């Protein structure tokens, strides 16, 4: 329940299994002897031939060998289990044997997960390894799937208790023995069958955790539309089950290759998209559609995401779930952390948790809520945080999917945004307590901490929600919407249509909207905080799209520009990611806004400060080029306006004066083209290409395009590499045509952000790529024949 969304699907032990295998095989003290029984079993497991199961040996033989090898009697138990689990068995004896096997594996797995990998001196091999080698995993799969077999028209049944034992043993083996999870993942019919076991509350948690671990290593994504009665299954989940189910959904609705989306080359992504078009919707897209077709699914997620701590499940129910965790190892670390929190707070609050003894039956229930079973408040909060992590992740992925507009409508209708606003101070951005939950092996500032992960997931959701969508105004309250209208009225400009169309019953309530709350915590964030990047991205997404003067002024009035400049100039920020996000935000905030440039000049009021600012810009144009683009566009607009206020800013602003110089523009242009190549273009650095195009489009408007190309040629020659820059630019523009002429969304974004029609973008690129060497605006006119290299094939190898 508490896994970070960015790592959804990763099992507790998966990253450590190689160590267990080393420990197991190292027990021979060298290369195994020919004829060694374990080696033969291992070969049989790999080939499917020869020795593969305990049933192929006599009990006498296994007992004798066990005395020498100390296998804890596991092979003999598997032999008995096979005998007592036939189709006509009543499974009573079978269940008794499972209860003998379970503790032999569970303690070993618990030690493995908690990194206390101390194999007892009596055993040479881990019990889980022996269990798997003698066919235990395959046998349990068969037992679990017996209900799918019909005899004389009647389906077999096994008890929930027996299913729980089988699932626990399977999971423990997956944790400790390398390769078991992958083998289970290859059994697609078994994976689909596991979903049916989630219909029972008694087996839900074990099943969900095993499925999550299996899906995390499955090469091909499972299709949810193959799960029998998916809609009924999900609709019958209670809220706790639905929150846990979101862990599985995180693996099934996310595209498998999106981990480092900005780092993948556009060539590779374009090739993948072409391939995808021929194959139809991806499994992730099919799964998203399947979920959205379930009645009430998104509404329930919104309720879970916005549920207050006081509304969450009662203590007894939570205790029961924790008892499950006690033997369910994927959550052992979380349980360990929760118990530490409880112990710390009990010293101050005299409140503690009392678990029933391990053997207590479910029928007897758990102790009633009393002074001894009251949960500390911080524990309740952590419980809720771990749920919300998964839910917010799923909502975020759905918001970025093909059905984005449908999801947007539902999220707005079910009041997700005002609900999150009400939770902001008490849960999402609450102050850290001394006993804030910290996972085993991590510290309080680690990005794996549930507290921190929730904040990042929340910010990612806001970014996805606001990005190029009119619903972004739901982040404000009624008073703030009125403020936007007043700003437009005072400036004598039309009100933003989206503001007028906003349903006031769906906006935030209270004294401050969600955007204002975000600005407040953003300005208080420490310089080294990892949240700065995500906060800036979330606020920038509110400004993206067609530039809105009212939106900019709303943020300027709250001191956002001064905060950004402080971070860039005065805080000595070193993080490239944070600087890039702040440069991007500053560009959107200042674009075409005279008041913003006045505020900039007021803050950057000395040459020393301005030089620090320029140093930050010039240190990495990949990070700062969006700001360069916005200032260049603003300068062009201001120069064409007849207004005293604009004229005053043009004459006083250091930044505008700096950008207006042709040598400055040429320096930026040369470096922007030089730092990118077709083979290295990514979603992150393709903006450098578009910024260079903006500079040349504005030059073309002023009939200065030939001058700029001639200057680029001279700069090339001064570097003693004639043709290297213009050939590269020619190839980049050829790729630009291939990439953008088939991308409706991307082209719309270019048009909206620059206020230059996309047709003008296309015309300018065509003019630059004109093959006529007599054209003064064609790149080939400035590349000398011996250095011409413009027909390079940039197909992804």
Curated annotation (Swiss-Prot):
Pfam families: DUF3689. InterPro entries: ARM-type_fold (IPR016024), TRPC4AP (IPR022162). GO terms for molecular function: calcium channel activity; phosphatase binding; ubiquitin-like ligase-substrate adaptor activity. SUPFAM superfamilies: ARM repeat. One of its GO terms (biological process) is hair follicle maturation. It is found in: Cytoplasm, Perinuclear region. Keywords: Acetylation, Cytoplasm, Host-virus interaction, Phosphoprotein, Ubl conjugation, Ubl conjugation pathway. Phosphorylated by GSK3B; phosphorylation is required for ubiquitination. Ubiquitinated by a SCF (SKP1-CUL1-F-box protein) E3 ubiquitin-protein ligase containing SKP2, leading to its degradation. Phosphorylation by GSK3B is required for ubiquitination. One of its GO terms (cellular component) is perinuclear region of cytoplasm. The modification N-acetylalanine is found at residue 2. Residues 2-400 are annotated as: Interaction with TNFRSF1A. Pathway: Protein modification; protein ubiquitination. Its main location: cytoplasm. Substrate-recognition component of a DCX (DDB1-CUL4-X-box) E3 ubiquitin-protein ligase complex required for cell cycle control. The DCX(TRPC4AP) complex specifically mediates the polyubiquitination and subsequent degradation of MYC as part of the DesCEND (destruction via C-end degrons) pathway. The DesCEND (destruction via C-end degrons) pathway recognizes a C-degron located at the extreme C terminus of target proteins, leading to their ubiquitination and degradation. Component of the DCX(TRPC4AP) E3 ubiquitin ligase complex, at least composed of CUL4A, DDB1, TRPC4AP/TRUSS and RBX1. Interacts with MYC. Constitutively associated with TNFRSF1A. Directly interacts with TRADD, TRAF2, CHUK, IKBKB and IKBKG. Interacts with TRPC1, TRPC4 and TRPC5. (Microbial infection) Interacts with Hepatitis B virus (HBV) protein X; leading to prevent ubiquitination of TRPC4AP by SKP2. This is Short transient receptor potential channel 4-associated protein. It comes from Homo sapiens (Human).
